[in-house]
């Protein structure tokens, strides 16, 4: 995390523009801008600002927003439920679509259903969410009027952002599920189960499918960080009041502490998900033991 913190600090301070100038506006005098820079501590050398930044992280203090004077941790925690709600909905959409699609494609390999599932997966991977989001909004919100286009309040507000965010992950998971399940179906133990009279559905779902889940779970854990990153774009498109939108707004205002805090939060969440993924291996495969 030290490397992430250092990289974030360096990149943030390379962004062109002056936070004090952005806060006061273009019409502010040089004296007012300089006074605000001194009050915010932006006139100090970068190494002093960097040291204060690391010391704050060590204390659990991410600093204070330059624009609102609100603690960064408080600002992130206020937006966190919305981001977690969107991320969870996107994961439910992606897993709920991908797993059945991957199973059907593997079991019906070479048939029309397999080709259809493969085509859908390739389409989902090819369409970026910054293009899919506006397309969904135009079709289902503006033209058809079936769903709200922006905001957060009801379950209907969640549908379009969740589909936009989860589509690419669903496509990737479907391909992984298909490939992993096909590999397991070739294993001798599956053939032995079928020879003992086990039905095909039972052999697939009870034996092959469970063993094929390990790479799928790995991918889900790794892609969760991608979901949080994609949420930055999706939340901005649909005006979803989460951490991703907060990050974009703070970049626009050159709010260094808030930008740093949001990026660190995403990085720490990614690390935590990788840890949980490793722990899930032992549940899926009893042969795996941790020392």
What are these regions (language model features)?
Residues 2-6, 46, 88-92, 131, ...:
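Hydrophobic alpha-helical transmembrane segments of multi-pass integral membrane proteins
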Residues 74-113, 142, 152-291:
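Alpha-helical transmembrane segments of integral membrane proteins
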Residues 43-99:
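An internal, D/E-rich "acidic patch" concept
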Residues 7-14, 44, 55, 119-148, ...:
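Membrane-water interface segments at the C-terminal ends of transmembrane alpha-helices
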Residues 3-51, 65, 141-160:
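Hydrophobic alpha-helical transmembrane segments of membrane transport/permease proteins
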Residues 9, 13-14, 66, 90-122, ...:
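Transmembrane-helix boundary motif in ABC transporter permease subunits
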Residues 38-47, 59-72, 150, 173, ...:
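Membrane-interfacial helix-loop-helix junctions in multi-pass membrane proteins
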């Amino acid at each position: 995390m030290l490397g992430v913190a250092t990289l974030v600090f360096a990149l943030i301070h390379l962004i062109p523009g002056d936070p004090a100038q952005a806060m006061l506006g273009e019409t502010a005098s040089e004296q007012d801008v300089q006074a605000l820079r001194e009050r915010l501590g932006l006139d100090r050398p970068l190494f002093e600002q960097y040291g204060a930044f690391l010391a704050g992280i060590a204390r659990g203090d991410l600093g204070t927003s330059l624009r609102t004077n609100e603690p960064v941790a408080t600002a992130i925690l206020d937006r966190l439920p919305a981001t977690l709600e969107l991320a969870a909905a996107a994961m439910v959409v992606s897993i709920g679509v991908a797993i059945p699609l991957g199973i059907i494609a593997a079991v019906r390999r070479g048939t029309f259903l397999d080709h259809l599932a493969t085509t859908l997966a390739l389409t989902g991977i090819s369409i970026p969410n910054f293009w899919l989001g506006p397309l969904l909004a135009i079709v289902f919100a503006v033209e058809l009027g079936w769903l709200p286009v922006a905001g957060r309040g009801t379950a209907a507000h969640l549908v379009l952002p969740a589909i936009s965010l989860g589509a690419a992950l669903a496509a990737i998971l479907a391909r992984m599920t298909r490939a992993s399940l096909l590999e397991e179906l070739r294993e001798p133990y599956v053939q032995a189960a079928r020879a003992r009279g086990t039905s095909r559905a039972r052999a697939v779902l009870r034996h092959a499918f469970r063993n094929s889940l390990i790479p799928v779970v790995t991918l889900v854990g790794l892609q969760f960080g991608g979901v949080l990153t994609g949420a930055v774009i999706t939340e901005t498109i649909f005006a979803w009041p989460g951490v991703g939108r907060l990050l974009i707004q703070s970049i626009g205002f050159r709010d260094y502490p808030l930008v740093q805090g949001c990026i660190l939060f995403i990085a720490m969440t990614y690390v935590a998900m990788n840890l949980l993924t490793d722990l899930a291996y032992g549940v899926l495969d009893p042969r795996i033991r941790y020392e």
